[in-house]
Curated annotation (Swiss-Prot):
This protein's GO CC annotations: extracellular region
Protein name: Pertussis toxin subunit 1
Enzyme class: transferase
Keywords of this entry: Disulfide bond, Glycosyltransferase, NAD, Nucleotidyltransferase, Pharmaceutical, Secreted, Signal, Toxin, Transferase, Virulence, Whooping cough
Its biological purpose: S1 is an NAD-dependent ADP-ribosyltransferase, which plays a crucial role in the pathogenesis of B.pertussis causing disruption of normal host cellular regulation. It catalyzes the ADP-ribosylation of a cysteine in the alpha subunit of host heterotrimeric G proteins. In the absence of G proteins it also catalyzes the cleavage of NAD(+) into ADP-ribose and nicotinamide. It irreversibly uncouples the G-alpha GTP-binding proteins from their membrane receptors.
Induction: Activated by the two-component regulatory system BvgS/BvgA.
Signal peptide: 1-34
Any Gene Ontology biological process: symbiont-mediated activation of host G protein-coupled receptor signal transduction
Keyword Disulfide bond: yes
Effect in UniProt of substituting S196P: In strain: CZ and 18323
Organism: Bordetella pertussis (strain Tohama I / ATCC BAA-589 / NCTC 13251)
Length: 269
C-alpha cells in the first residue's frame, strides 16, 4: 500500500489505524541511513545568489535540539532559534516544493491578492561532515531520551525520509550552483536559469554517517503525532497543510510520506 493512500485513510479513521498499517507494512530491509550518505543535497530558498553565493546559509540561532527543529518549534513559525539549516537529498522533492510555492502565487493573483509573478531558487550544495541525517538523528534522540516508542515505525520512516540538517551554517564554498525559476504572472510562462558559484570549492565529501546527538528539550515530553515529510521537515514545509493536501503534494513528487508517533515535544499542527 502506498503511504499516500494510508495518509488519506488516516484522515478518515484516525492515527491508530495508521499506526497499525505501518506496523504491518514497514520495510524489513536496511534503513535508509544505513546507505552511503549523500554527496549532494538541495535547498529551496527565496534569496538570490547575489546574497547566498556571498554569505552562504546561516541558522537562526543555537538551539540544537533535533525535535524542536523537526516539529517547527525552533523555526520561523516558532522561536526562530534553530541551530540547523534544512536541506534534502531529494532534488525532485525540492522542485515540487518550489512548484507548490509558485502555484500559491498564481492562486493569489487569481484571488486578486498579487501579481502572479514568482521567483524561487534551488541551491545545489556539497554535503560534508557537518550535515546529519534527520531520521537517524531523530531515532538517536528517541534512544537516548525516550522509551523507544518511535522504533515501531523506524523502517517505514527510513524508506521515505531524505532531510539532512546542516549544523549552524553552510558556507559559500559548499554551494555549487543554483537554479532560478521565474514565473511570469502575465504571460504564464515559466523560465529556468542556472548559475554556477565562482566561490565553490570542489572536494570529495559526503554527509556525516553518524546522527547528530541532541541535548534534551526543556519542553514537556509527551506522546504526539508528528508529520515527517521527505524534505525539510517543519522548517521549510508548511505547518498548516492538511494530511490530504500533504499527501497530494507528496504524490506529485512520486515520493511518499509517513506519520511518526514518538515521545517528544507537545506541538500542535
Amino acid at each position: 500500500m502506498r503511504c499516500t493512500r494510508a495518509i488519506r485513510q488516516t484522515a478518515r479513521t484516525g492515527w491508530l489505524t495508521w499506526l497499525a498499517i505501518l506496523a504491518v507494512t514497514a520495510p524489513v530491509t536496511s534503513p535508509a541511513w544505513a546507505d552511503d550518505p549523500p554527496a549532494t543535497v538541495y535547498r529551496y530558498d527565496s534569496r538570490p545568489p547575489e546574497d547566498v553565493f556571498q554569505n552562504g546559509f546561516t541558522a537562526w540561532g543555537n538551539n540544537d535540539n533535533v525535535l524542536d527543529h523537526l516539529t517547527g518549534r525552533s523555526c520561523q513559525v516558532g522561536s526562530s532559534n534553530s541551530a540547523f539549516v534544512s536541506t534534502s537529498s531529494s532534488r525532485r522533492y525540492t522542485e515540487v516544493y518550489l512548484e507548490h510555492r509558485m502555484q500559491e502565487a498564481v492562486e493569489a493573483e487569481r484571488a486578486g491578492r498579487g501579481t502572479g509573478h514568482f521567483i524561487g531558487y534551488i541551491y545545489e550544495v556539497r554535503a560534508d561532515n557537518n550535515f546529519y541525517g534527520a531520521a537517524s538523528s531523530y531515532f538517536e534522540y528517541v534512544d537516548t531520551y525516550g522509551d523507544n516508542a518511535g522504533r515501531i515505525l523506524a523502517g517505514a520512516l527510513a524508506t521515505y525520509q531524505s532531510e539532512y540538517l546542516a549544523h549552524r551554517r553552510i558556507p559559500p564554498e559548499n554551494i555549487r550552483r543554483v537554479t532560478r525559476v521565474y514565473h511570469n504572472g502575465i504571460t504564464g510562462e515559466t523560465t529556468t536559469t542556472e548559475y554556477s558559484n565562482a566561490r565553490y570549492v570542489s572536494q570529495q565529501t559526503r554527509a556525516n554517517p553518524n546522527p547528530y546527538t541532541s541535548r534534551r528539550s526543556v519542553a514537556s515530553i509527551v506522546g504526539t503525532l508528528v508529520r515527517m515529510a521527505p524534505v525539510i521537515g517543519a522548517c521549510m514545509a508548511r505547518q498548516a497543510e492538511s494530511s490530504e493536501a500533504m499527501a497530494a503534494w507528496s504524490e506529485r513528487a512520486g515520493e511518499a510520506m509517513v506519520l511518526v508517533y514518538y515521545e517528544s515535544i507537545a506541538y500542535s499542527f
